[in-house]
Amino acid sequence: PAAEAAEVQQEQTAAPAEQETALPADAQTAGEPEQQLTYVALGDSITSGVGLADMKYNIAQIGYDLRPNFEGYSSQCYTALVGKGLGLDRQHAINLGLPSLMSPDMVDMVQSSAMPKMNQASGSYYVYPEYQEYLRKADIISIQIGSNDALVPCIVGLGEATNWKSEQLAGLMVSGALRDFNFQKLGLFLEALNRMVLTFDESRATNRLLFRGMDEICDQAYTNVTNSLPQIVAGIRALNPDAKIVLLGYTNPVPLLPAWNRYFSKLNRFAKDLAAQEGLIYVDIPRTQTAADGHP
């Protein structure tokens, strides 16, 4: 009768739906592109790739605009190498390295995507509304910061001690012009050095800086970094609680100065302890070699 026919018809129309839902998961996703992780590298000039010929930037009203380098960075910088190792394209391996950045500046960038004012000592000023957005989308975030907290006061102190006769030499060294040292670059270095004809008072002030002032500079830098790093980690977690955070260790670009050796040794211990306490990944880099410009 009619009731039985209706039941048969209902079973026949239901069968295709059952077959459709029974398709294997891999068949349903066939043809879709494989989803990539997103890696974001935070840092200063070491991260950005200063000294590498194909680093990208524009001249800004204050300092430099690093936006072109966020995805157009050098193929030799470590963001590129990590991205290549993870099989990531440029849209999924982001270089947020900002030259001259100090650790309190990175706190500002993580918390608000902007420095509230120019850092007078370093001459840097960065405002990038997309900075936080990159952090929100990241699966892995590495942090490299702290070298400039000692280097910038050192350069400023040397300038003050020499009445800024050291400015050309310091600018030459940090610009990357002395990278891959050769006889031509040795000539540039000696020319800048010969222009530093110091008076007796300038020589005395320079010696005082190198042998006593460095301890004060490095002690203050250590305080700045150890206060800032936990804030940076907390700021990242507020934006993206699921991201894996990697703390990069420190290498000393000025190994001849005992104060700097102590500074970077203490920072490595602090970063390692912080990683253990906060569930971060700590990566030691003891064998990193630096060029004459202080960059790896």
Across the structure, where does each feature detected by a protein language model lie?
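Serine-esterase "nucleophile elbow" of acetyl-processing enzymes
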Residues: 21-99
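Stable alpha-helical elements in mature extracytoplasmic
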Residues: 74, 78, 127, 221, ...
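A structural motif corresponding to the C-terminal end of an alpha-helix
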Residues: 81-89, 228-246, 270-284
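Sec-dependent signal peptide cleavage junction
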Residues: 1-6
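Catalytic His-Asp segment of secreted/periplasmic serine-dependent ester chemistry enzymes
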Residues: 250-296
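Structural recognition of the beta-strand scaffold that forms the well-ordered cores
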Residues: 38-41, 47, 93-97, 140-144, ...
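Second-shell loop/turn segments in exported
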Residues: 64-71, 215-222, 259-260
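Oxyanion-hole/transition-state-stabilizing segment in secreted/luminal serine hydrolases
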Residues: 50-52, 105, 111-220, 252-254
